[in-house]
Structures are given as structure tokens and as C-alpha cells.
Amino acid sequence: MECRPGCGACCTAPSISSPIPGMPDGKPANTPCIQLDEQQRCKIFTSPLRPKVCAGLQASAEMCGNSRQQAMTWLIDLEMLTAP
């Protein structure tokens, strides 16, 4: 499955504890990554600077649903279930 154009849910909903260029302490949940562009695409998608946790997250029908809102809901729910 390929990412839905204009979505960016996986770069917004989850917290990321790994450093990201421009976000050395990672990012909190429900906060857009600084590396998202105006089209909700990752500016460092093909860069070696992209965190491994980001590269390891793959689009799936379960996670992405049928809309950005469904993806945000699924990812925020997962974030709450896995928070320390």
C-alpha cells in the first residue's frame, strides 16, 4: 500500500522520541513533524537523516483506513494504548 496523498497522519499523530532534523528531542503526539511540507509529504523521506522509526512505519489498510481522519483516529488510539 502507498501513502495517501495529502495525509501525513503518521507524521502527526504519534509521538517520536528519536531526534528529527529540526526537532532534536523528537516530537509530541498530535503535533505535525517539522519535516512535513505543505502537501503533507516528508521532506526527508529518502534521506539518511530520516529516523529509523519513521522508515519502519509502513502504510496499511488497517492503519490508514479510508481517510486522513480515520488514520489520525487509529494512530491516536494506538498512541494512547502504548503510552508509558
Swiss-Prot record:
Protein family: Belongs to the UPF0153 family.
Name of this chain's protein: UPF0153 protein YeiW
